[in-house]
Amino acid sequence: SATYTVKVVSDSGNKYRFNNFGTSAVTLDLAEGGTYTFDGSDSSMSGHPFVIGTAANGTVYSTGVTYQLDGVSVTYSAYTSGYASASTRKLIITVPASAPVLYYWCSIHSGMGGQINTNSTLGSSNFDGSTQTIVKANTTAGFSIVSYSGNDTSGSTIGHGLGVVPQITIIKRRIASEDWMVGIGHILGSGKEGHYVKLNATEAEG
């Protein structure tokens, strides 16, 4: 479960952007059974009612969806008609089991949104780093599983959903054969942040 703040930015036309992430109209991943709040209270959203459907700019999806304006639950028609004049605007969805592929879009203008993939095991989109991730986290246990596509950019960061820096990170490449890298820098102490060992290998710590 998560809350995403939504705003509209100019990016080859108006586009939705989540949590001030650097990319617009991204594909979202939401976990079945999770509850997600899309907060469209930013002033840029006033003329762009944020809705979810089963097709891009198409049929509205209502299963598990609640619309709120100024803290009051309203119908879909009241939500879209009163969106611009409301101070706070939220769409809340609890993703049902076996939910279809969904889409988020503006009920007035086309071309602003993107796709929503739903899943039963992977987790949900995270925008805390410079690279978008899919995170399934257990903050009580201090453990999370993160999936992402790297961009070979030095200094890139990823969100992990734990709220604190993890002491150990284990990285497994999915598109090539390579030993699992285990980051141990935070155990070794200050100045050792980049150090790691490899599972199934005999090299020294690097």
Residues covered by each model-derived region:
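Short strand-edge motifs at loop-to-beta-strand transitions and within beta-strands
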Residues: 26, 89-93, 156
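Charged, alpha-helix-forming regions
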Residues: 121-206
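Negatively charged
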Residues: 30-33, 68, 77-80
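N-terminal edge beta-strand
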Residues: 4-32
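Solvent-exposed, conformationally flexible loop/turn segments
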Residues: 31-33, 88, 152-155
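Extracellular/periplasmic metallocenter environments
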Residues: 45-47, 72-121
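Acidic glycine-/aspartate-rich tracts in secreted/extracellular proteins
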Residues: 10-14, 41-46, 54-59, 97-100, ...
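Residues within well-ordered beta-strands of beta-sheet-rich folds
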Residues: 29, 35-39, 92-94, 103-107, ...
